[in-house]
């Protein structure tokens, strides 16, 4: 049976895991790392880079490098690259393709199914967008699971015989979530969740960027934030400084030749202390405390009832964040899970539950936001309150607002505000064919259905006429089926193009290697090769030389094969002559050199510096 992978599709970094031997295992990527930067870069030659290789060249290619696209999931934001528009779903799919390919390389087979995590506070549009991204990447998304819940699965898999109340504090690159769970007898029950989808490590970086930029502007009068290349250098320096300040009390920010004016080049060389960093980001840290209070209130628990505190997300390594959590909870956070990997591992556990590989685990998650409809006066009338266990179904009867009304528009909203206009619109649909009657007489039953992914379906039925209408919520920011299908086909096309490009370069590299080895060996053999044979080889060498730098791959393959076969025949003759009485001994290693080119691509000592492959742009 094919494996189902667990994916943590993060704002700044992503991770993929799979169940092996009853435990989740993190899959290393093609570069040997356990996490992959969520960065996509488009090259001038049409190649797409993903991950660390894309991040490395961001300074020289800032206009075509996309970072933190997760922050725009579920919105109508688009990135335009070389005249083509890309949605957040399509860009996220490129990252997912990379993770999928790394998993396939590790598992040695095709991967078609996955469990993907999202921030607990993601709304319906954001969840739908994540599912669409998976589909575009060629993955059937079996389940969307909340990140803090996934982290608790990774934490609690080997502690199922204990009863614990857990607080999961998840501060990632772009989002913040807190969830309260009860763990006991294999049941992981989410009691409440809260958060902020616009708060994360990127915001901490931005404070450093602004501090550097403002200081530089004060000294030079130049605002570096208007220069994309300089801004990218600031971003890298800010992230590096933030990381260094987690282990030291001061760091140096040195950016020579950051810009220039009429007076000459300008440089940045400044120190940033941890105390200053804490001052710059104090409100961000404090902004995580209110959601914790709300989550505890909704769970009807006091902080004293919490047994364990789990920190998730790379941003929880910031000392001020750890201190804030420690002071709020009065507990030392658990070190049982890796904050960068536990979400993907938990997703793999959930995948194991769905496939039957993991037994005796039951996950009960909740919907993070209240769902309702707009009623008379623009009021948001709730049908399903936040923190309701999912999957769930709830119905309520409404009526018409005017005499003789024959249709009603159902306006579906998500959020905690009293007025519909202040909440997130998930969608609208119309129920027609209502029998004319005085206002308040018709009975219209509205039913909300939330599946295990947290995705909403709504139906309305006129109990008098039996007329019915329903909608699977697809907000205007989501892609239609046709758009998803087109994106899927585009992704496949790019995958094929990249495979061809990769094959082309491998063929060229092989040709170059064989050409070099044959020419070298021919010179070393000297008069051991007859003039006639030498002329034959030189003819084949010239033929390969004439095509090896071109684009006709079949011609390169043929010329390479012709040269290889011709040299094999001469090698055989030399061996025969070497074995004849009185013949000089022949060094077989020389002939072996000719064969080396055939396996050039498998030789760890061969470096093909003219091409970088980021495993089919996954």
Curated annotation (Swiss-Prot):
Signal peptide: none
Pfam families, sorted: HSP70
Phosphothreonine modifications at: 175
Domain of life: Bacteria
Stretches the record annotates as Disordered: 579-618
Keyword Protein biosynthesis: no
Expression triggers: By stress conditions e.g. heat shock.
Molecular functions per Gene Ontology: ATP binding; ATP-dependent protein folding chaperone; unfolded protein binding
Record field: compositional bias (Low complexity): 591-604
Keywords for the protein's UniProt record, in alphabetical order: ATP-binding, Chaperone, Nucleotide-binding, Phosphoprotein, Stress response
InterPro entries registered for this protein in UniProt: ATPase_NBD, Chaperone_DnaK, Heat_shock_70_CS, HSP70_C_sf, HSP70_peptide-bd_sf, Hsp_70_fam
PROSITE patterns per the UniProt record, alphabetical: HSP70_1, HSP70_2, HSP70_3
Family membership noted in the UniProt record: Belongs to the heat shock protein 70 family.
Xref: PANTHER family: HEAT SHOCK PROTEIN 70KDA
Function in brief: Acts as a chaperone.
NCBIfam families per UniProt: PRK00290.1, prok_dnaK
UniProt-recorded name of the protein: Chaperone protein DnaK
Organism: Clostridium tetani (strain Massachusetts / E88)
Annotated gene: dnaK
